UniProtKB/Swiss-Prot annotation:
Homodimer. GO terms for molecular function: 8-amino-7-oxononanoate synthase activity; pyridoxal phosphate binding. It comes from Mycobacterium sp. (strain JLS). This is 8-amino-7-oxononanoate synthase. It comes from the Bacteria. Pathway: Cofactor biosynthesis; biotin biosynthesis. Its cofactor is pyridoxal 5'-phosphate. Belongs to the class-II pyridoxal-phosphate-dependent aminotransferase family. BioF subfamily. Pyridoxal 5'-phosphate binds at residues 104-105, 175, 200-203, 232-235. The keyword Nuclease does not apply. Keywords: Acyltransferase, Biotin biosynthesis, Pyridoxal phosphate, Transferase. It catalyses: 6-carboxyhexanoyl-[ACP] + L-alanine + H(+) = (8S)-8-amino-7-oxononanoate + holo-[ACP] + CO2. GO terms for biological process: biotin biosynthetic process. Substrate binds at residues 26, 129, 345.
Length: 382
């Protein structure tokens, strides 16, 4: 049978139609410079992406080191700027060492794959970030996915394994609903069964812990020898990039074995300079972390969410994707930019508005949010 004349991409139209019918098509929305909408959608938790010191940190780095890092960190892309920032962030979080990657996604890929591999066991929470899911798939380890925040299931997987090496991976703060992982209990299980714990602090750094040092710091696990922390520089620190923090032996191993580090161009100087400046602002102004949680509580109250949020994230479940998307659109039309999470990001039937609090929200911003959310959610919940 011949297939001549068939378009190899014809199937894309069919898939697009299916997504459209299910209310799951995605589209890029251009954000204008200096827009007037109140931002409850970005991950700029501390409001540092436009902070004068952070912007100047990026500009200063470009002037000194150029627009790009010019190569892999193993060739020409490793600068004094990269290493200085790594040392500063490690000291801030209580880690022995740090290694910067080009994104939080590649940091998770690099850490999980390089620290597991064939003949090992990976135990992953069912709601970990997509980068951790993909890392597990690429690892060639045996993977056990446990129910969300189920410590008993983690212990069962570790206790019944045949593999010598085991790694448990989890977010510290889960991105869709902002709830916290029971890190102390998970670590106790890992210690009993000789497993390494990898924790993604993307949504914990800058918000939880002493002065925003993260949930690991808050539960007394900062610098633990059997814990590896990953995080992004694109949320609380308002820049871009990712980092793996932990024992020096882990850093040395990743330099040798983490493919997203070895074969990727080093993070651009501007991003490193901005992240370092943001870290310095956080050190100087630790109250920003508290302000995030206070503003999240105000948003939760506006949405009739009963519990005080544990993080910057306030999740308002509306059910079907069309309802959530219409609500997000209505908010934007009234000057409020909110996130909209639909499957496959969240389970079917749980499409939601995802609001993110920022330390820099003003009283006027919160008043606008209360007014718009009251109007939009009343209509959406009818």
């Amino acid at each position: 049978m011949t297939r001549a004349g068939l378009s190899p991409l014809a199937w894309l139209d069919e898939v697009a139609d299916q997504r459209r019918a299910a209310g799951l098509r995605r589209a890029l929305r251009t954000r204008p410079a200096g827009g007037t909408a109140v931002d409850l959608a970005s991950n700029d938790y501390l409001g540092l992406s436009t902070h004068p010191r952070v912007v100047e940190g990026a500009v200063r780095a470009v002037r000194e080191w150029g627009a790009g890092s010019t190569g892999s960190r193993l060739v020409t892309g490793n600068t004094e700027l990269h290493e200085g920032f790594e040392q500063a962030l490690a000291a801030f979080t209580g880690a022995e060492s740090a290694l910067v990657f080009s994104s939080g996604y590649t940091a998770n890929l690099g850490a999980v794959v390089a620290l597991s591999g064939p003949g090992s066991l990976l135990v992953s929470d069912a709601l970990t970030h997509a980068s951790l899911v993909d890392a597990c798939r690429l690892s060639r380890a045996r993977v056990v996915v446990t129910p969300h925040r189920d410590v008993t299931a983690i212990e069962t997987a570790l206790a019944t394994r045949d593999e010598q090496r085991a790694v448990v991976v989890t977010d510290s703060v889960f991105s869709a609903d902002g709830v916290l992982a029971p890190l102390r209990d998970i670590h106790d299980v890992c210690r009993r069964h000789g497993a390494l714990l990898i924790v993604d602090e993307a949504h914990g750094l800058g918000v939880r812990g002493t002065g925003g040092r993260g949930l690991l710091d808050e539960v007394g696990l900062a610098g633990a020898p059997d814990v590896v922390m990953t995080t992004t520089l694109s949320k609380a620190l308002g820049s871009q990039g990712g980092v793996v923090l932990g024992p020096l032996a882990v850093r040395d191993h990743l330099i040798d074995a983490a493919r997203p580090f070895i074969f990727d161009t080093g993070l651009a100087p501007a991003a490193v300079g901005a992240a370092w400046a943001a870290l310095e602002v956080l050190v100087d102004e630790p109250s920003r972390a508290r302000a995030v949680l206070d503003n999240a509580a105000a948003l939760a109250q506006a949405c009739d969410v009963p519990a005080r949020p544990d993080s910057a994230v306030v999740s308002v479940i509306l059910g079907e994707p069309e309802v959530a998307l219409a609500a997000a659109t209505a908010c934007l039309e009234q000057g409020l930019r909110v996130g909209c999470f639909r499957p496959p990001t969240v389970p079917a039937g749980t499409s939601r508005l995802r609001l993110t609090a920022r330390a820099s929200l003003t009283d006027d911003d919160l008043d606008t949010a209360r007014r718009v959310l009251a109007d939009v959610l009343t209509a959406a919940r009818r």
